[in-house]
Curated annotation (Swiss-Prot):
Pathway: Cell wall biogenesis; peptidoglycan biosynthesis. One of its GO terms (molecular function) is FAD binding. Residues 36-217 form the FAD-binding PCMH-type domain. PANTHER family: UDP-N-ACETYLENOLPYRUVOYLGLUCOSAMINE REDUCTASE. The gene is murB. This is UDP-N-acetylenolpyruvoylglucosamine reductase. It comes from Rhizobium rhizogenes (strain K84 / ATCC BAA-868) (Agrobacterium radiobacter).
Amino acid sequence: MKQVNGEKLLASLGDSVKDIRGRLTPDAPMDRVTWFRAGGLAELMFQPHDTDDLIDFLKILPDDVPLTVVGVGSNILVRDGGIPGVVLRLSAKGFGSVELAGENRILAGAICPDKHVAAMAMDNGIGGFHFYYGIPGGIGGAARMNAGANGAETCERVIEVHAVDRKGVKHVLTNDQMGYTYRHSAAADDLIFTHVLFEGYPEDRTKIRAEMDAVRAHRETVQPIREKTGGSTFKNPDGLSAWKLIDEAGCRGLVIGGAQMSSLHCNFMINMEQATGYDLEYLGEQVRREVFEKSGVKLEWEIKRLGGFMPGREVRPFQGVTTE
């Protein structure tokens, strides 16, 4: 992949962006955005002021310019060759709010941290959201991938998802239209989530606080929350735990370059010392190979890998064939 050239792309848009209120940043370092703190450059990063600004930008963006949405930067691994085209990063000012929206209902912006929704629910005696206190990331990503923890999932609370497509057209998707399954939704890939409407149920605030405290205490004990990590690396296979398969394959604490499978929770990959995107992805693929050779189970990535490789630093995905 060629190195990105954001100034050239920005210049090609010309006067069409003069009325855009958001921030356009050519050659934006993605290692400042992602929770892994690794990866190459975004050719052109756009941070819209609000939904209307986002729509205006999408309407003028040429169809042949790639568009990638990164949210708050969790659950993604950016490759060292960078991300071509436009990287959309929603701003906290326009998409980070959380507010009450009727009886037992909460409306949250796509990059509102999950734990802020949990806190809003607790403060107002709304049950069903305590599990969000233990999930890193933002609400848009949670709605997209049906994030869950402690036996609960996002799909249980979603009423509707507000989104904008690549053409700048607004959409409202009901829970049924989201087509939720385990760590997945059927929403079209080109939909950009802007806000999510949730509904809970009346609950005693003291009970909710106790549940949230338990979630936090457990997470601090078993997850590397103070490390540079993107969250769970692999999805749990049906009826199995990814961490257990990784542990049984001898990959707890496995190190490649500056990347490591956490010794605390071995389904968490961490940037322990200036890891590159190559280090992290190579480590993940090596773990997939080791697990398959030990158990016959082919782990699926939960973390999204974005962008292109540096020349000569490509990582071949494990295809499920044992070593000779």
